[in-house]
Curated annotation (Swiss-Prot):
Broad class of the protein's primary localization: cytoplasm
Recorded name of the encoding gene: argC
Organism name: Geobacillus stearothermophilus
Keywords in alphabetical order: Amino-acid biosynthesis, Arginine biosynthesis, Cytoplasm, NADP, Oxidoreductase
Gene Ontology BP term (one): L-arginine biosynthetic process
Lineage: Bacteria, Bacillati, Bacillota, Bacilli, Bacillales
Name this polypeptide is given: N-acetyl-gamma-glutamyl-phosphate reductase
Functional note: Catalyzes the NADPH-dependent reduction of N-acetyl-5-glutamyl phosphate to yield N-acetyl-L-glutamate 5-semialdehyde.
Catalytic reactions of this protein: N-acetyl-L-glutamate 5-semialdehyde + phosphate + NADP(+) = N-acetyl-L-glutamyl 5-phosphate + NADPH + H(+)
Length: 345
């Protein structure tokens, strides 16, 4: 049985992590830490937690954190980059849900995140935890960088096409939409009910920090992939991401062969579900779960492939995938503690 800690448990992803780890079959203790609160029970921020044991927030201290088998960072940019290296040096396994270790080039991180990157030695050491496509590296990881929510949906949707070289490398367009929880829990005008309700709006046009993360992964699979066109929209719902992906095929593809390719690619991946030809997923189909559902189409007229990829941004896009990676790092079945079906309706 493992003892684990969560830093940043007062945010949405941190609270979801606590929910998953509190009921995990191999976790005996899950403690919570905060950079701003000490001695306060987590239920003060999240009443749904109730008066459970071990949910009192502790002050961040390296020596206190070093006693855990694994530490999860569910923190804003900059926190894990400062604290994680010392834990890694002490042999603690770190799973980071922020973007601090996703980009291998510190200069690229500084450009897109507007702050100094973590030490380069740790950027190189970090394993990118897109579980379905990096299992062996994840199993041996000490410092695990959990993918972002948009990159998870996008990369799972694109991987088979890019790896098989079936699409033109300069033709990728991603139109992504997210629920409001993706913006975090901190109050702001942009996520105020009156601003979001009955409204759809685009944001961070050509400037979203997940763009270089997606391109880095795509170019790892195929170095010829050109910069992508990527847009993000805020939708008046709590959870969910839908990434609608378009790419020009190099040659005509049978729609049935396309579906077969994806089914073969994700055979043995318990959390990726491929729809039958002509069927497309909705965000409600994965709500509250660690699943990624994918639907596919090919248009002979335009020679374009369309991929529809949906996830729950707080689960497969954050806490769920983090636990999936944690499971592999500890030598367990990747589905431990994650087998619940989506919540419906």
């Amino acid at each position: 049985m493992m003892n684990v800690a969560i830093i940043g448990a007062t945010g949405y992803s941190g609270a979801e992590l606590f929910r998953l780890l509190y009921g995990h079959p191999h976790v005996s203790q899950c403690d919570v830490f905060s950079s701003s609160q000490d001695g306060i029970h987590l239920s003060e921020s999240f009443p749904h937690v109730g008066a459970v044991d071990g949910a009192v927030l502790h002050k961040l201290e390296i020596e206190a954190l070093a006693k855990y088998d694994a530490v999860f960072f569910a923190t804003p940019p900059g926190v894990s980059g400062e604290w994680a290296p010392a834990l890694v040096d002490r042999g603690v396994k770190v799973i980071d849900l922020s973007g601090d270790f996703r980009l291998k080039d510190g200069a690229v991180y500084a450009q897109w995140y507007g702050r100094e990157a973590a030490p380069s030695a740790y950027l190189e050491r970090a394993v990118y935890g897109l579980t379905e496509w990096n299992r062996e590296a994840v199993r041996g990881a000490v410092l695990l960088s959990n993918p972002g929510c948009y990159p998870t949906a996008t990369l799972l949707g694109l991987a088979p096409l890019v790896k098989e070289g079936l699409i033109k490398e300069d033709s990728i367009i991603v139109d992504a939409k997210s629920g409001v929880s993706g913006a975090g829990r901190k109050a702001g005008l942009g996520t105020h009910f009156s601003e979001v309700n009955e409204n759809v709006k685009i944001y961070k046009v050509n400037a979203h920090q997940h763009i270089p993360e997606i391109e880095q992964a795509l170019q790892t699979w195929n170095e010829a992939v050109a910069p992508i066109t990527f847009s993000t929209h805020l939708i008046p719902m709590t959870r969910g991401i839908m990434a609608t992906i378009y790419a020009k095929a190099k040659q005509s593809i049978s729609p049935n062969d396309l579906v077969d390719l994806y089914k073969t690619s994700y055979e043995g991946s318990p959390f990726v579900r491929i729809r039958q030809l002509g069927q497309f997923p909705a965000t409600k189909d994965v709500y509250g779960s660690n699943y990624c559902d994918i639907g596919l189409a090919y248009d002979e007229r335009t020679e374009r492939v369309t991929v529809v990829s949906v996830i729950d941004n707080l689960m497969k896009g954050a806490a769920g995938q983090a636990v999936q990676n944690f499971n592999l790092m500890m030598g367990w079945d990747e589905a431990e503690g994650l087998r619940s079906l989506p919540i419906y309706p």
